[in-house]
């Protein structure tokens, strides 16, 4: 008897489930099941966290899109999602803007990650972890035959980015330099600018910078007399604000330099300057925008000794290196890691047939199917006509000599 009731219950569940799929991009053969972990996708974006939930399995479970809400806030319409039926399967989308991330009860936990840079400098980065859940409401009755749905999500960001993700954040470092007459402390800052004049700091639009946009960076020192200069040893980028991120792309290190990077000034004054073209990290391939953080390992050096600390890259400099006097370790300070970012870049889709040669003012010449067929037919007709002409000339050439000999019957009148 129990088996009959179980079979009847399964039949009742499957039939309404197929009917509930009407009007939505669902497949009864694929989505006649209860939700699983794979039915939610979480995208930790530049400006928002986006969650996409398989709506077909929600329908099969007996719920609608209005039954799902962030962190149990079922009475707040701002904490609900919306349906996108233009995908397969249909999904319910939830968006959490980083500027209002705690609006629907999301949890923010700040932690400090210690680390050591490649140069042995002790660093610590504060990271903010945003977590929460999406669930269905509890029934008002004591029991329920519907399963309770629960989806969890989590994203981590540098804390300085969460505090104000509309502006660039830059770190500063204090370097202590010991001299014969005492010790002084200088402050270094890494700033980003729009152009080579270094007058206006970089402003990133909400949609991000186009790829290959040139950005100008400068390391500026304060509280420094004329005997000391700024020397940038190593500048690199990471997809996060953590200078110790395993994923990094070097801009310049010693004599190795990215082709799109230009070192304008280094070791010659109290400011180091360079430029580079922005890019995107491949790990952000599923996102429309990418974050790039810039880091520079910088030190102070005496103005007279900075040339000896610069890398020897050209043959002439190697030849002249033997003439240089030796310098003492006291001629430079310790290194500091400076960071700036995030630089937000966007990936614009470019049509594959959008390239052309010649003057930009001339319209591109494109061949459609009809034009290609006409040109092919004309070429074939021309080749055939030329072949027939050659055959005709060959036949005439063969008959030419025989036509000069006259044959006939002798007329007796002329005898």
From Swiss-Prot:
Transmembrane segments: 373-393
Signal peptide: 1-19
Intervals, Cytoplasmic compartment: 394-415
Gene3D superfamilies: Zona pellucida, ZP-C domain
InterPro entries reported in the protein's UniProt record: ZP-C, ZP-C_dom, ZP-N, ZP_dom
PTM annotation: Proteolytically cleaved before the transmembrane segment to yield the secreted form found in the extracellular matrix of the cupula.
Expression across tissues: Detected in placenta, kidney, lung, pancreas and at very low level in other tissues.
Disulfide bonds: 44-155, 79-104, 235-296, 255-313
Single biological process term from Gene Ontology: vestibular reflex
Record's keyword terms, sorted: Cytoplasmic vesicle, Disulfide bond, Extracellular matrix, Glycoprotein, Membrane, Secreted, Signal, Transmembrane, Transmembrane helix
Sites annotated Cleavage: 319-320
Domain called ZP: residue spans: 43-320
Region (Disordered): 323-360
Residue ranges, compositional bias (Polar residues): 325-336, 350-359
Glycosylation sites: 121, 164
Intervals, Extracellular compartment: 20-372
PANTHER family in alphabetical order: ENDOGLIN/TGF-BETA RECEPTOR TYPE III, ZONA PELLUCIDA-LIKE DOMAIN-CONTAINING PROTEIN 1
Function: Glycoprotein which is a component of the gelatinous extracellular matrix in the cupulae of the vestibular organ.
Name this polypeptide is given: Zona pellucida-like domain-containing protein 1
Taxonomic source organism: Homo sapiens (Human)
